[in-house]
Amino acid sequence: MLKKTFLIVTLFSFSALLTSFTPVKKSQQFLKTVIIDAGHGIMANGGHNGAKGTYSYEDDICLAVSKKLVAQLRQTYPDVKIIETRSTENIVSLKERANIANHNRGDLFISIHVNAMPPIQHRDLAGYQTEVYYTGKGKKKKKRTRKVPQYRYYTTPNTRAKGTQTYIWGAHKAEDKEVAVRENAPMLAEENYQEKYGDIDPNSPEFIALSLVKTKQFGQRSAMLSQMVEQEFSKIGRISGGSKQRQVGIWVLQATAMPSILVETGFITNPDEERYLNSGEGQLELAASITKAVGNYINWLEKKQNPAAVSALLSRQAFPAKVDESFLEALDHHQHTSR
């Protein structure tokens, strides 16, 4: 049973990677909606929710960079719909951010953040304190003293870390991502979905298998975009920390039914980086790099399409419950040789 489930998933994986639920057309627009998420925000009590530098806050930098990114994306890709999850200084809940992205049927989710290092912990010997203690019992009980070291504990800012990092959700979060994909399946389907594929039960084994593969597809696309973002950062002289899976703090990435990345634009705890992140020039550079990465991502999607393979696949049942192994082996061979 496990083997057959794997075989079904393998077929869906290939079909999802090629079709993204729909037949490929030469005039197809590969990116229709991009969601830009400015991280954090000011809370109802007026407090800041993100990291703090010497004189600035993550909330403000995220919004400033996101605004410039939105403007550049709209100018560069006028046919692409750009949606903001947070357009003001006020905080938006993580659940609402995901709802905005899923409701607008985003093809891409880019969350803008600022990194920070925790302060360095220090312990210094401040002196000694005399401590009285007793040994023995009864007539043999004796009073004694000893010197006990006293320490002073304090912290200093960690200013060494610098550079960018771009994250995707961790592998252990794939199940949560798959749930998001399945729950938002009606939003992902095109208007004439039933006409093309018939009545599909989102709880059916076939649809669950497809959701699992769609999750895998989103993971691959997220990883590709994250690498492209870091490559563009390197081109402008930023120190790139690379593309990584994030184990914590990425709920909004796993709750969005689309390729999703979280961009750490720099370390606010580094004085040089804090100045750069607050400068108009720095914010424009960061926005331009991400915009170029989106363009590279679109080109990559276009090159991945294989209309011939899609046509052959669509000639079969749209959501097959069983697939012969020889067909799967042929598809798997094609997938590996076409890389």
Where are the predicted features?
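Positively charged n-region of N-terminal signal peptides that target proteins for export
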Residues: 1-5
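Active-site-proximal helix/loop segments of hydrolytic enzymes
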Residues: 24-32, 51-339
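Peptidoglycan cell-wall recognition and remodeling modules
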Residues: 44, 48-52
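Bacterial N-terminal signal peptides
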Residues: 8-16
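Short connector loops/turns at beta-strand edges and beta->alpha or beta->beta junctions
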Residues: 39-44, 266-270
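Generic alpha-helix initiation/capping and coil-helix boundary signal
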Residues: 6-9, 94
